[in-house]
């Protein structure tokens, strides 16, 4: 019994190994994407870490909604201070507690516990710092109307002194210059506020409890860091990264030169390395026990493809520190909803963030030389964090290893490949040609001399055009399926991304197999694998040019898979050329074939019993029909003279040549099926080397990118984004992931495409007809209720896709018989705002009860917002607004005419680091305060030129209410005040919101549409 080579280029081995290797790559990728490494079985895996304690802290912090503008937010802040004190006392640490704020405010000692002249730890309860700025640049870098912001912070900070830090209480020096203090330190940041519609378990409760455990870890005996740590629990992140910006006026501002930002942009899963400042700081993350992340996420933020921001942009872009952004990023449907709770989180996710962040913080703290000194950009307004290294390129390997290298190195690698790879192939072509073994592109050989009438066909062009035709056809079908889903059922990817992946992968595989296998069956060619390699090399070389340009000019690192792909294709293509050295020289083969034909022709003139065998003419006719190579390859039945008419041969000659063929073709060099006779000497095992070069790295890198990109964008359609983008990502990456199969797929057994065609049919039907949402993948709708305080009327607005918003509104009892008005949303492009009368579910805000019932007069809400205007005597274009809101910390002033300047009484003044005052003036002003009663006093100035200047008011003259309208006309000050109410912990407070939660379908979720859930509106 004959034993075949298990790695031979035959149907069985190719089918087996391609399936096994792809499954061995794709299954782990999916497993890592969907699961989280388990938490240690012991609650104390290392001294200084207690997971049971951390989980208890998380459940306590997330007991209620706790946005900045809520009573429960204050509870969380107090709890964090209590936990800090308990940890420090338990670890027997000398520490002090200080009240601190702006740098020009005297620091006073509030409480001392085990205090000394140089405490090991200092806790700062910052209830003094404030920050003011104006800008016309949005958080995503887009231009907006001018917006001013005033924010009063309530940040909690812990300074852990490092062994190499400056001694004493250096923050009391009173110096306002930006300088390196000692060797600098490491900032670890998380925010303790949640959105009004979510409990904040992962956004950002896990970040907060991770910092508490980091405090426990580094204050445990023997764990003092080298460079000091500054642990920051900031407040107000959800309303515009406000807590981080308030740190600008902290006396500790200049100390940290590096940072680790802990965030949640999803609701569980693994914590991904979202962004990093540069290569050097990214190497700190290499120490992580379970690294997870890729540079594509960072480039997505840089290019504005990710429509959200984290505090990273403040630390890195504005303050100039260098650091890491570690965040949860999926599942996005639970983000900012009531499912961001501990029920839908897990200790494993908490451990993943905690263990990785501790490793990164320790590595940054131990590095005492890299991250301090003069900046490369010379910006004196930013922290001196040393010269930035090259932008980093990074990706994890199955959640275990982590590769980091510089973008400059990647560019050098790309440039080298662009020059060297085609040069080496050209040299190989030259050598093969010199040795007369370049079978590629060879049609025929003239045995005697050029112009001979009896050339021998080589068939070297056969298979040349198959790849572009096959990929063009298969790729077009795959891309067409993306447009089909976008047209018929655009939201299906929201909950069923794997069904979409399965449909497009199977479609491309089946169509590619049909075209390449079909052409190979009709006209077999031993060079098909080599020609496909040549085509792939050319395409990847062209892509590499684009990647090199983006690396050099745009500093985009996401093209690294193309560099790896081209490297693998280059080596694999080299193998295809080296295989030709095993063949006989073309002229030697042609002479031998020519001589064999002559012998057979002479023998064919003799009568023989085999003359009764009919000639095999149909195969000859079939070969004539192939347009790729008009010449026959020489076989024992080919006429000596190329192009001669075989009909002149006798039946005896044809029959004898058939017998001669069977006797003269030894099995040792027998070609595969009906491929060219000379191909029998090609090695049959080299294909597995090529496949191992092409498939693993390509599938791993592109598979990671595909899974991450789809997870990050699949919910974008619900927010008004283009769903086509997500489908095109899946379609293109399906092509890229499977294209390494192209050189070998014509040897795959037909059972595989039959099975995949059935999978395609099933997933196609499902994707076209299935409802796109479910209880585990809820559609997110944005809620806000607005009150006109002048007449007490109220309306509820739900923002989302028209079709689904109407379905939800129809389920709400209070909407029965109400008129629903829908208009295109101004705030969220692609969505609609659907409003209805909210009088049946009026908000019960401060003072809204009379004798235990909701008041129904049109004056019931007038007390919520108050504004008093005083006009300056020295200028008709200056005035002062005193604004207050009952039981709210947040208001927004919208001016009818932009103001050229504003100042908040008691503020630090405009901070130019956070934005330049818009030339066109400020059209709206956002106001945040830390208490519930102190009014905002705002001085404003307006003129035609909208010039920026100081506001210096003289004697003020009060203006009574009857004169307000006259003041609007004469002085030009008028507008609207919207105050915000965010506390939905008591259902009766905002019954419209709780009605939505209670009565809407289980596939619907609700998130805040504005700073608050309710906004009373008052004209002034």
Swiss-Prot record:
Gene3D superfamilies noted in UniProt: Zn peptidases
Transmembrane parts of this sequence: 12-32, 411-431, 468-488, 492-512, 530-550, 562-582, 691-711, 725-745, 751-771
Necessary cofactors: Zn(2+)
Protein residues bound to Zn(2+) 2: 203, 238, 336
InterPro entries: Fxna-like_M28_dom, M28_fam, Peptidase_M28, PFF1_C, PFF1_TM
Pfam families listed in its UniProt record: Peptidase_M28, PFF1_C, PFF1_TM
Annotated stretches, region: Disordered: 609-648
Protein name listed in UniProt: Vacuolar membrane protease
Classification of source organism: Eukaryota, Fungi, Dikarya, Ascomycota, Pezizomycotina
């Amino acid at each position: 019994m004959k034993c075949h080579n298990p790695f031979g280029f035959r149907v069985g081995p190719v089918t087996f190994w391609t399936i096994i290797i792809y499954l061995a790559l794709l299954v782990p990728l999916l497993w890592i994407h969907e699961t989280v490494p388990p938490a240690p079985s012991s609650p104390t895996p290392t001294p200084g870490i207690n997971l049971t304690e951390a989980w208890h802290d998380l459940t306590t912090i997330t007991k209620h909604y706790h946005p900045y503008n809520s009573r429960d937010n204050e509870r969380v802040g107090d709890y964090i201070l209590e936990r800090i004190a308990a940890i420090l006392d338990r670890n027997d640490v000398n520490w002090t507690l200080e009240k601190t704020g702006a740098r020009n405010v005297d620091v006073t000692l509030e409480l001392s516990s085990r205090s000394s002249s140089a405490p090991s730890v200092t806790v700062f309860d910052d209830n003094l710092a404030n920050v003011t700025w104006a800008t016309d640049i949005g958080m995503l870098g887009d231009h907006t109307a001018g917006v001013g912001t005033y924010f009063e912070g309530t940040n909690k900070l812990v300074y852990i002194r490092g062994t190499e830090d400056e001694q004493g209480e250096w923050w009391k020096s009173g110096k306002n210059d930006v300088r390196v203090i000692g060797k600098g330190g490491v900032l670890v940041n998380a925010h303790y506020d949640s959105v009004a519609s979510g409990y904040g378990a992962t956004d950002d409760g896990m970040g907060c409890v991770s910092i508490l455990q980091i405090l426990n870890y580094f204050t445990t005996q023997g764990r003092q860091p080298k460079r000091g740590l500054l642990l920051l629990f900031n407040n107000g992140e959800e309303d515009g990264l406000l807590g981080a910006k308030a740190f600008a006026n902290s006396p500790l501002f200049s100390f940290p030169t590096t940072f680790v930002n802990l965030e949640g942009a999803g609701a569980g899963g693994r914590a991904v390395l979202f962004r990093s400042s540069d290569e050097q700081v990214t190497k700190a993350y290499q120490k992580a026990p379970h690294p997870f992340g890729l540079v594509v996420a960072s480039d997505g933020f840089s290019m504005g493809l990710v429509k959200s921001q984290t505090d990273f942009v403040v630390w890195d872009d504005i303050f100039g520190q260098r650091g890491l952004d570690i965040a949860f990023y999926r599942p996005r449907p639970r983000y900012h909803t009531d499912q961001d709770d501990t029920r839908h989180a897990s200790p494993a996710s908490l451990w993943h963030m905690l263990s990785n962040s501790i490793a990164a913080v320790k590595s940054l703290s131990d590095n005492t030389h890299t991250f301090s000194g003069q900046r490369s950009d010379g910006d004196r307004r930013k922290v001196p964090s040393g010269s930035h290294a090259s932008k980093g390129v990074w990706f994890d390997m199955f959640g275990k290893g982590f590769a980091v290298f510089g973008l400059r190195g990647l560019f050098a690698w790309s440039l080298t490949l662009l020059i060297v790879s085609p040069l080496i192939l050209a040299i190989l072509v030259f050598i093969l040609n010199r040795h007369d073994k370049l079978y590629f592109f060879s049609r025929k050989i003239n045995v005697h001399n050029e112009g001979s009438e009896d050339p021998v066909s080589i068939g070297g062009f056969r298979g040349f055009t198959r790849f572009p035709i096959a990929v063009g056809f298969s790729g077009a079908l795959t891309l067409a399926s993306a447009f089909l889903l976008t047209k018929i059922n655009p939201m299906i990817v929201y909950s069923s991304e794997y069904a979409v992946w399965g449909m497009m992968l199977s479609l491309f595989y089946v169509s590619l197999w049909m075209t390449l296998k079909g052409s190979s069956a009709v006209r077999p060619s031993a060079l098909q694998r080599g020609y496909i390699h040549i085509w792939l090399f050319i395409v990847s070389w062209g892509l590499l040019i684009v990647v090199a340009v983006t690396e050099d000019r745009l500093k985009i690192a996401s093209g690294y898979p193309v560099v790896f792909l081209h490297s693998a294709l280059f080596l694999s293509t080299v193998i295809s050329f080296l295989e030709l050295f095993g063949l006989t020289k073309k002229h030697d083969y042609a002479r031998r074939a020519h001589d064999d034909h002559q012998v057979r022709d002479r023998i064919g003139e003799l009568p023989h019993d085999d003359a009764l065998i009919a000639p095999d003419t149909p195969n000859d006719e079939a070969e004539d029909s192939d347009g790729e190579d008009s010449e026959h390859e020489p076989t024992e039945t080919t006429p000596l003279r190329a192009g001669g008419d075989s009909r002149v041969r006798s039946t005896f000659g044809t029959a004898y040549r058939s017998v001669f063929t069977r006797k003269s073709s030894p099995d040792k060099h027998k070609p595969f099926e009906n491929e060219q006779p000379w191909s029998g000497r090609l090695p049959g095992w080299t294909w597995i080397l090529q496949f191992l070069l092409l498939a693993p790295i390509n599938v791993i890198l592109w598979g990671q990118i595909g899974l991450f990109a789809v997870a990050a964008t699949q919910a974008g359609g619900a927010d008004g984004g283009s769903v086509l983008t997500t489908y095109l990502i899946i379609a293109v990456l399906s092509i890229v992931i499977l294209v390494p199969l192209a050189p070998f797929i014509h040897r795959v057994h037909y059972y595989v495409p039959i099975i995949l065609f059935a999978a395609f049919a099933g997933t196609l039907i499902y994707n076209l007809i299935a409802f796109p949402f479910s209880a585990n993948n809820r559609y997110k709708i944005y809620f806000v209720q607005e009150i006109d305080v002048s007449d007490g009327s109220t309306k509820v607005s739900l923002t989302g896709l028209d079709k689904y918003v109407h379905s939800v509104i129809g389920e709400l009892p209070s909407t029965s018989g109400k008129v629903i008005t829908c208009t295109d949303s101004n705030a969220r492009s692609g969505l609609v705002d659907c409003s209805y009368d909210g009088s049946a579910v009026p908000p019960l805000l401060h003072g809204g009860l009379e004798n235990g019932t909701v008041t129904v007069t049109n004056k019931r809400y007038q007390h919520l917002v108050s504004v008093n205007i005083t006009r300056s005597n020295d200028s008709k274009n200056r005035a002062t607004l005193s604004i207050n809101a009952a039981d709210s910390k947040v208001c927004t002033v919208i001016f009818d005419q932009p103001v050229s300047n504003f100042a908040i009484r008691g503020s630090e003044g405009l901070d130019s680091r956070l934005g330049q005052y818009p030339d066109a003036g400020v059209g709206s002003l956002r106001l945040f305060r830390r208490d519930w009663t102190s009014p905002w006093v705002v001085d404003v100035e307006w003129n035609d030129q909208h010039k920026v200047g100081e506001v210096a008011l003289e004697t003020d003259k009060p203006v009574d209410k009857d004169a307000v309208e006259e003041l609007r006309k004469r002085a030009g000050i008028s507008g609207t005040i919207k105050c915000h109410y965010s506390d939905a912990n008591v259902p009766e407070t905002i019954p419209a919101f709780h009605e939505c939660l209670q009565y809407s379908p289980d596939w619907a979720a609700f998130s805040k549409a504005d700073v608050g859930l309710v906004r009373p509106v008052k004209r002034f």
